[in-house]
């Protein structure tokens, strides 16, 4: 589990797969934080992705770390691969409405990116949508890595 969490922490963003109103997949990059089996996201208070998550709260979140082209034989196309690791998480979105809880989670999200504290104005906290996803399934995969690198 520590290796999986290390991959997540190396990622500057994740991609979130949601289902739209017609049942089609909708995948978007989002900033995030991960702590204790929970993924936190933030967005504007309304819009397409919020509406989709309200109607279809099941999501798939992917993290991918490392992007190096490798090959076994330079002249054999099928021997090429991308050297990387990925983590796929499944869970359900719950939107956080409590103002103090939103501030706490905003701190967690910002700690993912910077090492200093923020103060949040009342309107800023009120106008942000905080997504909480408790991960109920997590898988990991590596590509193009030697066994010693996995």
Show which residues each predicted segment covers.
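Short beta-strand segments
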Residues: 11-45, 61
């Amino acid at each position: 589990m520590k290796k999986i969490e290390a991959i997540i922490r190396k990622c500057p963003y994740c991609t979130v797969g949601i289902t739209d109103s017609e049942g089609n997949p909708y995948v978007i990059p989002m900033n995030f934080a991960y702590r204790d089996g929970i993924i936190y996201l933030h967005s504007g208070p309304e819009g397409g992705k919020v509406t989709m998550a309200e109607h279809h709260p099941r999501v798939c979140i992917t993290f991918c770390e490392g992007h190096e082209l490798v090959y076994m034989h330079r002249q054999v196309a099928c021997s090429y691969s991308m050297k990387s690791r990925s983590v796929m998480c499944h869970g359900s979105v719950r939107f956080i409405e409590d103002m103090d809880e939103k501030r706490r989670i905003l701190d967690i999200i910002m700690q993912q990116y910077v090492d200093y504290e923020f103060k949040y104005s009342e309107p800023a906290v009120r106008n942000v949508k905080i997504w909480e996803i408790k991960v109920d399934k997590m898988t990991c995969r590596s590509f193009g890595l030697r066994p010693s690198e996995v």
